[in-house]
Curated annotation (Swiss-Prot):
General function of this protein: Component of antiviral defense system Zorya type II, composed of ZorA, ZorB and ZorE. Expression of Zorya type II in E.coli (strain MG1655) confers resistance to phages SECphi7 and T7. While most T7 infected Zorya-containing cells undergo abortive infection, a minority produce viable phage progeny. These eventually accumulate to a high multiplicity of infection, leading to culture collapse by 170 minutes after initial infection. ZorA and ZorB probably assemble in the cell inner membrane and exert their effect there. This may be a nuclease.
Ranges that cross the membrane: none
Keyword tags: Antiviral defense
Disulfide bonds: none
Domain of life: Bacteria
Species: Escherichia coli (strain ATCC 8739 / DSM 1576 / NBRC 3972 / NCIMB 8545 / WDCM 00012 / Crooks)
Protein encoded by which gene: zorE
Single Gene Ontology BP annotation: defense response to virus
Protein name: Zorya protein ZorE
Length: 367
């Protein structure tokens, strides 16, 4: 006997809870998390041998992580009252961690990819509590995060630092997203938001209002942005069609995570449509992935000319070997999300160019 079951309400509920641009299907497989993802969401003790090699961001089994010291003996009570009184957490291989590495003190560190800014600390005597710790300022400088090479700017970034925004800025660098981003629901939208969004995007022909990319072949990467930040204000003058990359770059939109595959699609379409042309530094930042902005900003700070975004690098037989995020053809250097080797070029991954300039290893005379 066949049963007729009306599940339309369930489908509508699923559509409301999913991120913008994503459809809901009952036959989709649920998101499975490895045990390591569960451990990292609460904090896992690690040693230096456990961490993936690299000179910029800290990575553990393909996952972007933070390092912090759980043991707050001697300052536990002070840290609970004021997180700034606690020990700093680390987002990059800064000089502080280099010193710890030399002292072989990494057994004291825990790794986590929790994005709410809370860290579980203890007093060594059985008491533990989640605390809002502060980011290491050496780490900010190490990545030149949002221009932290400037001391005044670094202090401003330190005070306003958001882990959610940080993970969003570097989401393209890792194979796995933090578990915390899947625990959120899209609250605040009206019940028929999906229909409104589809109508607005169709009227705009799925063209991003900022960068101009046509996403008719990748509609899931086409979003609708509320200019005033109020999700239930759906007057047409308050709605703006943006690609997912431009959407995450809007103020207070750090909750949008772009994967490396998604960014590659957006950049490929921009390139095919002749949109990767920039006449100013601001346009360079608009057209490149936020994860390499620290490296690009370092070159700007040192007085170099703006790079070429999305440049195809060819071998001697004119075959395209790699498409890099940003390049300085005259210097034969480039920055990219992933490692690449092209004869005659020096290609840096995220944070490597910053470090080479900071340590004095990079000079135009050597090129």
């Amino acid at each position: 006997m066949k049963l007729s079951i009306d599940i339309s309400e369930l489908i509508q509920l699923g559509k409301k809870m999913l991120p913008e641009g994503v459809d809901f299907f009952l036959d989709e497989s649920p998101i499975d998390f490895d045990p390591i993802d569960i451990e990292l969401s609460t904090g896992k003790e690690v040693s230096i041998e456990d961490l993936d090699p690299g000179s910029g961001l800290i990575s553990y089994h393909g996952r972007q992580v933070l390092l912090y010291i759980r043991d707050h003996s001697g300052r536990y009570d002070a840290a609970i009252v004021d997180g700034e009184k606690g020990k700093r957490f680390h987002i990059a291989w800064c000089r502080t961690l280099d010193e710890m590495r030399h002292k072989n003190r990494f057994e004291r560190y825990h790794a986590t990819n929790r994005i709410d800014g809370l860290f579980e600390i203890d007093d060594g005597s059985g008491r533990s509590q989640d605390v809002d710790l502060r980011v290491c300022m050496n780490c900010l400088e190490r990545l030149n995060y949002k221009g932290s090479i400037d001391k005044q700017r670094k202090r401003e970034i330190f005070k306003s630092f958001s882990l959610n925004e940080f993970f969003s800025d570097y989401s393209t660098c890792f194979r796995h997203m933090p578990k915390g981003i899947y625990d959120k629901t899209n609250s605040g939208y009206v019940e028929n938001w999906k229909e409104i969004s589809k109508e607005i995007r169709e009227k705009a022909n799925y063209v991003c209002n900022d960068c101009g990319v046509n996403l008719s072949t990748a509609k899931n990467l086409c979003h609708v942005h509320h200019k005033n930040g109020i999700k239930y204000d759906n007057h047409h003058e308050n709605l703006l069609v943006l690609c997912k990359d431009c959407h995450r770059k809007q103020p207070l939109h750090e909750g949008i995570f772009v994967t490396q595959a998604e960014m590659a699609i957006i950049q490929r379409l921009r390139s095919q449509q002749g949109l990767l042309k920039a006449e100013s530094w601001n346009e360079i930042y608009d057209l490149t992935d936020p994860s390499v902005h620290g490296d690009i900003n370092m070159m700007q700070h040192k007085g170099f000319q703006p790079p070429v975004p999305g440049l195809d690098l060819q071998n001697s037989e004119h075959e395209i070997i790699a498409t890099v995020e940003a390049a300085w053809p005259g210097l034969k250097i480039a920055v990219n999300l992933t490692p690449a080797e092209v004869e005659g070029w020096r290609i840096y991954t995220v944070g490597e160019l910053v470090k080479e300039i900071q340590t004095g290893a990079f000079t135009p005379a050597k090129l």
